[in-house]
Amino acid sequence: MEASKQMRVSRPYKISESSKVYHWPGHSTTVLQRLNEQRLHGLFCDVVLVVEEQQVPAHRNLLAVCSDYFNSMFTLGMREAFQKEVELVGTSYVGLKAVVDFLYSSELELDGSNIDYILETAHLLQIWTVVDFCCEYLEQEVSEDNYLYLQELASIYSLKRLDAFIDSFVLNHFSTLSFTPDFLQTVSVQKLCIYLSSGQVQHTWEYDLLQAALQWLTQQPEREVHTCRVLENIRFPLFPEDILLQRVKLAMCSLLPSEANGEGFVEEAMHYHNSLVAQPVLQTKRTLLRSEECLLFVGGEVSERCLELSDDTCYLDTKNEQWVKETSLPARRSHHCVAVLGGFIFVAGGSFSRDNGGNAASNLLYRYDPRRKQWIKVASMNQRRVDFYLASIEDMLVAVGGRNENGALSSVETYSPKTNSWTYVAGLPRFTYGHAGTIYKDFVYISGGHDYQIGPYRKNLLCYDHRTDVWEERRPMTTARGWHSMCSLGDSIYSIGGSDDHMESMERFDVLGVEAYSPQCNQWTRVAPLLQANSESGVAVWQGRIYILGGYSWESTAFSRAVQVYDREANRWSRGPDLPNAIAGVSACVCALNPRLEEKKKKNKDKRQDRGQ
């Protein structure tokens, strides 16, 4: 003690009392390396693991830290906690040594000769990092020759990650695998139903899936009891009527016994086809297309005089970042409205000439079925409408306001596919056109617009409850606007861009501002402004982002072909793939489309090439 006092040096001045923390980056690595050196030299090891009459020395502390199995063994009063040697059952020396080596070195070498042993041991000892490494290794090894074995392995060890990967593999190769003897003999009814019910299953057309189902059912007599369970995953309404009666029904009758009751699915599909107009409200899981939703634009007024109004309906091909024509409208339209109900695209009203002041307003309603790529004309609206809003809510459409040859409208009417008719409901409190609207939790919201009176556009926000047939005022926007866009994303309603008139000069100017409304708080908040003007543009929410398509600038009197994309998380606008033409008065929507046969074949070929097969 005296010596230590003599070693101290007196301070000529005071040292700061502030503290600083120092970090040794390689500390944990060094500790692990030293522990491994001790283990290899037999130093301080306090337990010996015994398996297959071979010994693996280790440190209890490290085993307990890395393994829930050993932690329970050494801390819950089991007899192994006091034994020098602990014998393990249900594992192998190869697996145990590799896993213990990993705990000390953080390195794991996997190959075809040891993967089974290591996975078995890691699962027993509950060392989930090693289990994940094994899954990652096996995922790279999945092939048409071993996927069934690996699927069984995933089932034995409850490896959800590997099981999901193999399911994805089967879905991507279903047209090849589903007719192989191994698949037909081995795949369980549970797995078959998962594959047949998926929207991602590889197939050229629905008949391929029906054949796979019938082949599986007829492999073994005892599978007859699963007929309804399997066939309920085949989307019979997607077959045309002639195919249903001539091929589908014939195939089922020839392969299945009459008591299997397979014909009920054909009858259900025929009822669907015979109820043509009501199909949007007859949707079940069997009427849905097996495809992802696409972003589309419909019609509009193009800037090139020679083109005038457009009849294009195009979707965005994300792989090639270009717009591809899906179909042509039955009639050219601009400043119309589009809504999707039951997977059908409805196009209502709009102008049939470049003079869209209301004199050329239409009351026609067309419906597009992406399943059959077919347009039909259904019941017309009671009033001609242009510059209005069309909502899809529950099992009906709602047309709100607008204008026609008689001026601005306050009327609101609903369309029922069940009756193929329009019915007036509670009207707006005032004449309104050039407004925007959206749906939020089964309520219709509209904002802004004009009423032909002299003065600027409105700030008001209205909410319609179709259950009570009542319109109510909500907190107005911070910015007056018309010809703008509205949409719902997450828990907010967005009011986007548009234009307004100066109070003094009545000159039109562009509004680039964007604001978000919270229905819960009844409050507006400004968010990032648009990159450029967007009056009379199309709007849709797709894959968690807002898309603004085309539009018009009143200040530069120019049409736009720009696509503006809003990322809510980043609160930022960016540019998407340009439209084929500069266009305004366009509508947009999101809907699942039925790829053409040649597109499906190309997609299946691309999948095989991507996997090097």
Swiss-Prot record:
Limits of the BACK domain: 147-249
GO biological-process terms attached to the record: protein ubiquitination
Occurrences of domain BTB (ranges): 45-112
Matches recorded under Gene3D superfamilies: 1.25.40.420, Kelch-type beta propeller, Potassium Channel Kv1.1, Chain A
InterPro entries, alphabetized: BACK, Beta-prop_ATRN-MKLN-like, BTB-kelch_protein, BTB/POZ_dom, Kelch-typ_b-propeller, Kelch_1, SKP1/BTB/POZ_sf
Pathway it works in: Protein modification; protein ubiquitination
A GO molecular-function descriptor: cullin family protein binding
Keywords: Kelch repeat, Repeat, Ubl conjugation pathway
Residue ranges of Kelch repeats: 294-343, 344-395, 396-442, 444-491, 492-544, 545-593
Superkingdom: Eukaryota
PROSITE patterns: BTB
SMART domains: BACK, BTB, Kelch
Binding partners and assembly: Interacts with CUL3.
Record function comment: Probable substrate-specific adapter of an E3 ubiquitin-protein ligase complex which mediates the ubiquitination and subsequent proteasomal degradation of target proteins.
Protein name according to UniProt: Kelch-like protein 36
Organism: Rattus norvegicus
Gene that encodes it: Klhl36
